[in-house]
């Protein structure tokens, strides 16, 4: 069933400026690299319609969710799993802004940011995810 025109659809995005800024505050773990601009520009978006700051509890929940998918995501915080038996640690130079890092199987480091970014895909604009509902 197709969504009605009034249905608001939000896409979770990687906001380009935030991603670049986050990468500037960390060093990749040994054996990992930072992604190239060309790579990042293929999937990041310029600007977000809504930014949601993550509380410490939400950030911890996000880390736990990432760790639960160890065959897909490797959190670079020194933890090990059967899938990723070698510890990977990213150097975090501004942990108050970028409290962690992770990578996929390509071992390209990505910043764990203190916000989630969304772009409106359909529906009336709003200044928050649930605005007007």
Language-model-derived ranges and their functions:
Residues 1-133:
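Metal-dependent de-N-acetylase/amidase catalytic core
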């Amino acid at each position: 069933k197709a969504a009605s025109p009034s249905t608001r659809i939000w896409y979770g995005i990687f906001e380009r400026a935030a991603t670049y800024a986050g990468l500037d505050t960390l060093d990749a773990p040994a054996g990992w690299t930072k992604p190239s601009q060309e790579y990042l520009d293929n999937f990041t978006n310029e600007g977000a319609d809504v930014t949601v700051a993550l509380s410490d509890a939400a950030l911890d929940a996000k880390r736990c969710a990432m760790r639960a998918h160890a065959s897909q995501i490797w959190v670079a915080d020194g933890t090990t799993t059967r899938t990723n038996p070698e510890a990977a640690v990213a150097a975090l130079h501004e942990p108050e802004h970028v409290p962690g890092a992770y990578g996929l199987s390509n071992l390209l480091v990505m910043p764990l940011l203190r916000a989630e970014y969304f772009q409106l895909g359909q529906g009336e604009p709003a200044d928050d995810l649930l605005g007007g509902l």
